[in-house]
Amino acid sequence: MEQAALKSSVRKEMALKTTSPVYEEFLAVTTAQNGFSVDDFSVDDLLDLSNDDVFADEETDLKAQHEMVRVSSEEPNDDGDALRRSSDFSGCDDFGSLPTSELSLPADDLANLEWLSHFVEDSFTEYSGPNLTGTPTEKPAWLTGDRKHPVTAVTEETCFKSPVPAKARSKRNRNGLKVWSLGSSSSSGPSSSGSTSSSSSGPSSPWFSGAELLEPVVTSERPPFPKKHKKRSAESVFSGELQQLQPQRKCSHCGVQKTPQWRAGPMGAKTLCNACGVRYKSGRLLPEYRPACSPTFSSELHSNHHRKVIEMRRKKEPTSDNETGLNQLVQSPQAVPSF
């Protein structure tokens, strides 16, 4: 009804406009510019609203499309809720049984839904109750490919049930080459034999059934340690013999045989000990000087202090002067003057 009223009002207004002088001037200008007459152009044809049914059909089609889109947008949510609430989670089989024509969704949406169902199922199978207790879980057939039988998780066990015993390392140097032998040597002590017997007592273990513990064996390619000690002792004996053959050195002034350094003296290089050589170099080496370690040291005749040595020499000087004066008087008599 409203559309019919609008159509009648529009027609009346257009009829009034065609009779106005402004409209006539507009038509004259357009005909002069475009080159067609007014008779060929009619306003009624332009404003012909006889195709109202076409517009009505288009509106109904648009409404139907909107409803289809709304229904299609609601259907995936319902399907997702049903998948979450279900307990068996058979995602791939359910989507395979339904034809694609029933779902009004594109191929990309279907792929996304399948991926979501696989992800949910994988997460629930990984964190399910039986898997937490340690028992193997069965996987669905679509996860194992074309296999008909379910794949069970296999727990691997090491071939060595008991730990392999190891020999304690010693702190001595191992200079010689060592070869590992498969059999136990008979020269090992009671402690080593007891340890090997206790460690290899398990006959059921396949590792120790044919071989004992590996023990190092010293080869004879390099000389053993005692030979090295013999070499050292021979060197020391040789050096001692050389020292015996050489004349033993001693100080020419005090007779000392051991000194930290030999120094030059009146007899040549390395003829005085360290103490006597220092005093000889400074000009203070006197016969009364002797170091305390000298074998010829006498406290009455010698001293190792320079002041005491000078005092001793002063005590000896007066007697010697008096004796020399008396001798001169006796030997040279006074000449008697002649009359």
Curated annotation (Swiss-Prot):
Chain positions of motif Nuclear localization signal: 167-174
Pfam families from the UniProt entry: GATA
Region Disordered: start-end pairs: 68-88, 126-145, 163-206, 221-242, 314-339
Subcellular location: Nucleus
Protein function: Transcriptional activator that specifically binds 5'-GATA-3' or 5'-GAT-3' motifs within gene promoters. May be involved in the regulation of some light-responsive genes.
GO terms for biological process, alphabetical: positive regulation of DNA-templated transcription
Keyword annotations: Activator, DNA-binding, Metal-binding, Nucleus, Transcription, Transcription regulation, Zinc, Zinc-finger
InterPro entries to which the protein is assigned, alphabetical: GATA_TF, TF_GATA_pln, Znf_GATA, Znf_NHR/GATA
Descriptive protein name: GATA transcription factor 5
Name of the coding gene: GATA5
Family: Belongs to the type IV zinc-finger family. Class A subfamily.
PANTHER family associated with the record: GATA TRANSCRIPTION FACTOR, GATA TRANSCRIPTION FACTOR 5
Compositional bias annotation for Polar residues: 126-136, 321-339
